[in-house]
């Protein structure tokens, strides 16, 4: 390790006094090294750091929640909980909030969005999609990683004494974060060292390479692995560490009031930045005594001014305005401390800017100062305290800057550490646009949700079908999942055909047939596949008979009696040619004596022997293609709902087969409200919706008719069993209903109010993120995915040519 330039011997009581022994007489003075400048003594594997001889600290990383987008009521709740969080810390605990923005190696992000060529006929659109993802990644600032930490320290005689106390505080902090709905976890020694390494090497791309075993092998210390090549604190206003320029500043709070957006504005900068808020609680009795003393001093000064006024012959009530103002503020603070559950804290807010060049550094500091000025504060450089400022920016909970501001709990809590959540997951994650607040790419894996079922909701022209097609394309390129589409409007076949999928056209004139009586031996969990199949047949018959209030018990019993007879031949010898059809059920019903059986058979007659007999055939299409589209546009009004229900049963067949092969099945249902509109189909659809997750199915309902969807009695079950909602622009009446149903704040609601195509809100579990997605219209994929009539016409012309 290259050592720093020789420095003057630190004076007694100076900053470095605690890190050295005083040289003996005639002993050559030791050179001050970079490692000795880093202000801690030991870093344990468990994350406990001995900062000074009797000072120990631990660090907890915490994540963001949607504070800026929350409803005012929720904001107030979060703010009050944050105040309670701060009040937890008594005078024996120092703590430091660290907010670190640093550039990351983009290769990590590129790995997540990487789509490799497969050397097949789809490589042209596959690589086009991959290029689009790279362009979207470049638009955001995903290369800038934002992390948040809280570090707390206590005084103890030994690590044995410190450890149980630190662990108890850590548990309390994690529980307090849980109350706030914030994910958090404690850091181990390696993770804490990595933060310091990244602070010292912010402008470098070299990864942190360290393990405690290497210390034993090499005889080096932890500091040797994190230290830069050199420190240079020549100038009083900035410094250098290695080849990186840096400047440490503090926030001078001049404004009488601050907003809860102040910290968010600083953290929104797209430059390397470390914001450290050091907080030391003051003993409550001492704080009250201090304020009372100040009030006494102010009253004494007021009396002196009044005496002076009397001697001078003017009104004794006329006193300096500052004196009156300070007196009123002091009394208010005293009242807060005594009766409003407020504490007093000594707070230091530090900023560490770094850059590759002096010019870039000055620009970054200027930008930071501009934000401070916006809130009537000033950003002051730590003149001749640059080293202390840098070292105090390390998450060690040891403030070496002697500049503190006394603030009450509420005033301290105004630095709310929460802004907006990000969603960028690894694994089988798919692209869902850019975060409308941070401009970062949204990558999410629905399989990681407790319930991956989803809805895509939007008005006509908002981009709902396009969004579904984009997800289908992404699934096809990056996973091995099967994809099935129920297409009542004939909008999906261009994409499905382009991806080598199978389009099954079902209509009264089509020669493509699917048999509603199809079953496989894996149809249900138990050894009785007929049990669940009977639910479907009953729903089918209810729909055919128009039984709005359901079928009579006698009618259900008759059907239930017939089903084992109808399926007996197939179950004894499961060959495709032995699969029964609706005609077999019809014949069996005719053989029964009950009038209910004859009534059902009469209702079935038009579907068996009449003009609507399209579903009375053996399935004559192969259903083993990876991507299948059931085009039921030409079925007509009488058969469309029936067709959607039958397609849903075919999908269930596929799901049960895929489950045994441990394969997921994605099912997209356009015009989903049609299945929920009728009581006969709604109950069965909801039952399937609930069962899909357990069997590896991932259904997605797509609709523009929100009123019809929300009018269904079953919508509560759909929402409760859907952890993924992709909400685009909504009509006025629908917005209010959805806001109440999903607890959407007015601010969040603005993202689905008169929003542009491809803009809205993404609900992923408990995370709500506003998104925007402007797809490049020049891409070949766009032509395959668009649903605009004029653009779809161009696709047809190209295909025919």
Where are the language model's segments positioned?
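P-loop NTPase motor domains
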Residues: 65, 72-91, 98, 102, ...
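Hydrophobic anchor at the beta1->P-loop junction of P-loop NTPases
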Residues: 456
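P-loop (Walker A) phosphate-binding loop of NTP-binding proteins
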Residues: 459
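Structural recognition of the conserved hydrophobic beta-strand(s) that form the central parallel beta-sheet
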Residues: 483-486, 629, 666, 692, ...
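A short helix-turn-beta junction within AAA+ P-loop NTPase domains corresponding to the substrate/partner-engaging
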Residues: 500-504, 714-727
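Conserved P-loop NTPase
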Residues: 742-797
């Amino acid at each position: 390790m290259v050592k720093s330039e020789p420095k003057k011997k630190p004076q007694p009581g100076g900053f470095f006094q605690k890190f050295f022994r005083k040289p003996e007489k005639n002993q050559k003075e030791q050179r001050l090294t970079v490692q000795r400048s880093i202000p801690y003594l030991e870093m344990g594997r468990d994350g406990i750091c001995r900062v000074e001889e009797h000072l120990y600290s631990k660090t907890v990383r915490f994540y963001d929640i949607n504070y800026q987008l929350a409803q005012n009521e929720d904001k107030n709740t979060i703010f009050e909980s944050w105040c309670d969080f701060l009040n937890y810390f008594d005078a024996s605990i120092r703590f430091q909030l660290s907010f670190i923005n640093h550039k990351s190696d983009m290769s990590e992000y590129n790995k997540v969005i990487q789509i490799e060529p497969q050397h097949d006929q789809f490589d042209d659109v596959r690589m086009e999609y991959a290029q689009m993802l790279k362009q979207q990644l470049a638009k955001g600032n995903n290369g800038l990683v934002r992390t948040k930490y809280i570090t707390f320290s206590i005084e103890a005689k030994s690590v044995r004494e410190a450890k149980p106390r630190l662990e108890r505080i850590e548990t309390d902090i994690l529980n307090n974060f849980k109350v706030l709905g914030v994910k958090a976890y404690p850091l181990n020694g390696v993770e804490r060292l990595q933060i310091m390494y990244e602070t010292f090497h912010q402008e470098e791309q070299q990864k942190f390479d360290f393990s405690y075993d290497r210390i034993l092998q090499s005889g080096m210390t932890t500091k040797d692995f994190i230290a830069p090549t050199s420190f240079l604190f020549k100038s009083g206003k900035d410094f250098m560490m290695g080849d990186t320029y840096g400047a440490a500043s503090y926030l001078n709070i001049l404004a009488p009031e601050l907003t809860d957006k102040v910290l968010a504005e600083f953290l929104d900068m797209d430059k390397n930045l470390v914001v450290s808020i050091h907080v030391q609680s003051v003993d409550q009795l001492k704080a009250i005594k201090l304020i009372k003393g100040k009030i006494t001093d102010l009253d004494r000064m007021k009396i002196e001014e009044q005496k002076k006024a009397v001697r001078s012959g003017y009104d004794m009530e006329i006193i300096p305005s500052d004196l009156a103002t300070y007196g009123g503020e002091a009394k208010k603070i005293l009242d807060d401390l005594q009766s409003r559950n407020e504490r007093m804290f000594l707070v230091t807010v530090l900023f560490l800017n770094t850059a590759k060049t002096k010019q870039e550094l000055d620009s970054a500091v200027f930008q930071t100062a501009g934000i401070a000025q916006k809130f009537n504060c000033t950003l002051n450089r730590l003149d001749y305290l640059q080293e202390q400022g840098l070292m105090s920016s390390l998450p060690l909970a040891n403030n070496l800057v002697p500049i503190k501001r006394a603030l009450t709990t509420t005033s301290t809590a105004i630095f709310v550490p929460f802004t907006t959540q990000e969603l960028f997951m690894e694994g089988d994650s798919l692209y869902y646009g850019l975060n409308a607040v941070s401009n970062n790419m949204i990558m999410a894996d629905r399989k990681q949700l407790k319930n991956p079922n989803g809805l895509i909701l939007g008005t006509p022209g908002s981009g709902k079908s396009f969004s579904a097609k984009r997800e289908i394309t992404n699934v096809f390129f990056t996973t091995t999942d099967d994809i099935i589409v129920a297409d009542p409007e004939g909008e999906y076949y261009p994409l499905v055909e382009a991806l080598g999928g199978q389009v099954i056209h079902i209509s009264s004139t089509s020669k493509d047939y699917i048999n509603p009586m199809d079953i496989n031996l894996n149809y249900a969990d138990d050894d009785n596949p007929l049990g669940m199949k009977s639910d479907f047949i009953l729903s089918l018959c209810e729909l055919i008979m128009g039984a709005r209030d359901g079928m009579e018990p006698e009618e259900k019993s008759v059907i239930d009696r017939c089903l084992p007879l109808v399926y007996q031949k197939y179950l004894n010898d499961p060959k495709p040619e032995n699969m029964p059809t609706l005609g077999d059920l019809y014949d069996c019903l005719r053989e029964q004596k009950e009038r209910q059986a004859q009534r059902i058979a009469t209702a079935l007659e038009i579907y068996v022997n009449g003009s609507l007999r399209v579903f009375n055939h053996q399935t004559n299409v192969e259903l083993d293609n990876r991507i299948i589209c059931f085009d039921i546009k030409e079925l007509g009004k009488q058969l469309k709902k029936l067709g959607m229900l039958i397609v849903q049963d075919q999908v269930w067949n596929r799901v049960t087969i895929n489950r045994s092969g441990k394969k997921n099945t994605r099912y997209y249902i356009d015009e989903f409200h049609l299945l929920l509109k009728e009581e006969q189909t709604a109950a069965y659809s909801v039952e399937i919706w609930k069962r899909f997750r357990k069997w590896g199915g991932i259904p997605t309902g797509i609709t523009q008719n929100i009123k019809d969807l929300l009018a269904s009695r079953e919508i509560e079950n759909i929402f409760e069993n859907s952890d993924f909602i992709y909400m685009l622009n909504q009509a006025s009446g629908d917005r209010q209903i959805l806001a109440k149903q999903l607890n959407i704040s007015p601010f969040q609601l603005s993202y689905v109010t008169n929003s542009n195509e491809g803009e809205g809100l993404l609900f992923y579990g408990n995370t709500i993120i506003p998104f925007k997605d402007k797809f490049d219209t020049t891409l070949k994929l766009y032509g395959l995915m668009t649903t605009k009539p004029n653009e779809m016409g161009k696709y047809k012309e190209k295909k025919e040519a």
